[in-house]
Amino acid sequence: MKYGRALAALCFICLLCACTGPSVRYKHKVIGDMQSHNFEAAQARIKNAQKTYGRRDASLYYLDLSAQQDSINYSTNTLTLLTEAENRQEALYAKSISQKMASFIINGYTEPYRLKYFEMGYLFFYKILAYLQEKNLQDALVETRTMVFFLDKLRENTGKDDPFLQYFASQLFLMWGAYSDARICKENAENAYINFADSYAKMPAKVQFTEEDRNKGLLTVQHLNGMIPFLISQKTMVAWNRFGFAIGTTNGYETVDQNVLTAALAGAYGDAIAVALPKVQEVPYEVKGSRLLVNGITVAETTLVSNLTYLFKKNFDEEYNKILITSAVRAATKFLITKSAQNGMNKKDNTVGSITDIILTSLFTATENADTRSWFTLPAQIREANVLIEEGKHEIKLQLLDEDNKVLDEHLWKDVQINRGRHTYLYVRTAK
């Protein structure tokens, strides 16, 4: 009776924890909406899927919803969404032991999602952009200092940094006359760009002011382009030789014979267990560059200043061994629980023990999923152009270019006010 109650309780827990969040199909549909530049449809789809995020990952829901904004279709609730996501991330530091244990036994989804270091950095970036769109310079400065503090701690604790965010902060500090802070951030940006040279991102050329430019203002256009990769779950059956599990191949694991796999999936092979590992899924995009026009005249081409695809892959590679070990520990825990329950049942009836083995093996196989959560609506890259423009209202156009510099589309801002000696920011989100 004792083992029967334990088995029933364990099965119930598994079913409760089997939720895996938004599906791959859902993500593809949202991405499709964004690639068609139909951000209203993407927002509606995300809102309809709020329950699939659950309370546990509400921060990702708010982030995916907020990432549909730019200077053309900016919504006043963007700051509310971003602030809610930030507050929920801060609350995650009070994590219970029971959640941690469940993540070992069931799957990684039992714990709330904590943003990766680069995702947290770009949460600050999006909030600053929102403040700039609302012309709330004071709060934009406060958020910039918060972002820089985060980057400083990140560098001290891990040696990591984000060159673009440091550069972005330096430009904002210049805007407010905080020259010492601007100099420090610029130096950090230069060092970080050197360390991330293989990302192909670089700092934009410095805008040179001359005596003739005294009646001009600085315009910065940021082009948030493409879609960052996301993760999918790959499930494999691993054979156990008395608690040994084979790790080989360049992928960090090896699958067993197909006959064993088939039997294990049927719950009939007691010494095999499901292990799910994440895999990077890239999202192709056509736009490879962009060109800035002011009043119909070409003035600049954008520079790749941040490669978020690179950051995503680099972070995944750095975490893969940890993911692999966690998956192995979880698989071992499931294996031991299954065998313990089976042995307990065998003391009363061998047939019941065999059935217990089949039930638990099948149940653990069904609930085994890799943690594939991420802020999947982030751009793949950020491009930037800076140009000095005479004071007054201007027509600003950004042409989207393919790899052969053919114009695929364009985005227009009418009557953009440029003020003498001031810095104006515009940003556009494209995904095609």
Residue ranges and their predicted role:
Residues 15-41, 48-50:
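Bacterial Sec signal peptide processing site at the extreme N-terminus
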Residues 23, 56-59, 113-121, 161-163:
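Start-of-helix signal in alpha-solenoid helical-repeat scaffolds, especially tetratricopeptide repeats
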Residues 28-29, 63-64, 68, 119-129, ...:
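"A position-specific structural signal for the A-helix of alpha-solenoid helical repeats
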Residues 39-40, 75, 82, 137, ...:
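TPR-repeat structural position
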Residues 54-59, 88-99, 153-160, 190-208:
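Boundary/linker segments of alpha-helical solenoid repeat arrays
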Residues 79-90, 145-149, 172-197:
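TPR/TPR-like (Sel1-like) alpha-helical repeat modules
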Residues 208, 214-432:
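Short loop/turn and low-complexity linker motifs enriched in small/turn-promoting residues
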